[in-house]
Amino acid sequence: NDIEKSKIFYDNVLGVLGAKEGVFMPNLTGQTRYFYFLDKNTFCITEPIDGNEAHPGNGNTVAFNVPDEETGNKWHAVGLEHGGISIEENPGIREFENMKMYLAYLKDPSGNKICAIKIIK
């Protein structure tokens, strides 16, 4: 519910991944929105269009691809420096039955669950 605080957070964590500062693009009904462009992906933060308070999703996670563990660790550290909260296990490699991946989880300042991910082949 503090989009400017969220913008500062995402400017920094997505900056680690090469995104430029969020681009201000209000919608036609006046809500503030910021767009981030990452390679072939776009990420947006916005004030709720219905006028109600924003709430984090229950069971939702937005994942951002990282090229390696070092970048993921930096992404996580920068997130903590800008109001994020570390959740789940510490950043690192997790092994599953059919796959191995690097994961680093945070909650952003609004409580949304995000992670850095690298599939290891």
Role assignments for model-derived ranges:
Residues 95-96, 119-121:
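A short acidic/small-residue loop/turn micro-motif
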Residues 32, 36-74, 81:
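Long, continuous compositionally biased terminal/linker segments
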Residues 1-43:
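Core segments of cupin and vicinal oxygen chelate
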Residues 41, 100, 113:
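Glycine-rich acetyl-CoA-binding "A-motif" of GNAT/NAT acetyltransferases
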Residues 43-47, 105, 114-118:
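Conserved beta-strand in the GNAT
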